[in-house]
UniProtKB/Swiss-Prot annotation:
<feature type="domain" description="DCD">
    <location>
        <begin position="72"/>
        <end position="204"/>
    </location>
</feature>
<feature type="region of interest" description="Disordered">
    <location>
        <begin position="1"/>
        <end position="68"/>
    </location>
</feature>
<feature type="compositionally biased region" description="Low complexity">
    <location>
        <begin position="35"/>
        <end position="52"/>
    </location>
</feature>
<dbReference type="GO" id="GO:0034976">
    <property type="term" value="P:response to endoplasmic reticulum stress"/>
</dbReference>
<protein>
    <recommendedName>
        <fullName>B2 protein</fullName>
    </recommendedName>
</protein>
<dbReference type="Pfam" id="PF10539">
    <property type="entry name" value="Dev_Cell_Death"/>
</dbReference>
<dbReference type="InterPro" id="IPR013989">
    <property type="entry name" value="Dev_and_cell_death_domain"/>
</dbReference>
<dbReference type="InterPro" id="IPR044832">
    <property type="entry name" value="NRP-like"/>
</dbReference>
<feature type="compositionally biased region" description="Low complexity">
    <location>
        <begin position="8"/>
        <end position="26"/>
    </location>
</feature>
Amino acid sequence: MIDQEESNFNFNFNQPQQPQQQQFHGKSVKKNKNKNNNNNSESGNKNGGENKNGVEKRFKTLPPAESLPRNETVGGYIFVCNNDTMQENLKRQLFGLPPRYRDSVRAITPGLPLFLYNYSTHQLHGVFEAASFGGTNIDPTAWEDKKNQGESRFPAQVRVMTRKICEPLEEDSFRPILHHYDGPKFRLELNIPEAISLLDIFEETKA
């Protein structure tokens, strides 16, 4: 397996970045130290609570079998498509999943390795990289719901860029790496060792 530091892909497996709002509070301290000492204390408690609630909410959104353990960092993510939606994924440079994945996808940070699984062909495509933070309805016109115009069928979204064009992987080469639950289903959230193992295989099959 390619070591993280030796991999030619050089992805960032870092912890989620701090929101800009917290940096803004940091600048405000210089303007009014006394006032913001109290505000920062309250803000710290508030932000800490929000971060904690955000983590807890992410694990409540998906059943435990479909989520990484709480003590593991998200090291990569697999998005899912079929023959009908794959070209839209690539053309828009945008990946999306159904609403139940919204909180999970919010854990994605720029630079995280991403992969695209086509369940029509049972192949895994890569290698992609998150070009934005994961969010909700980044482009609501993508995969638009015909019954509800202006709403996406796959609102859990992230912008992507192609890092390296590789031959798609067949199931027998990547499934042993993944965490499975409920028979053939596999977890879309990847831990760091799983992500590096997939990058290892793609490195050997570059187009």
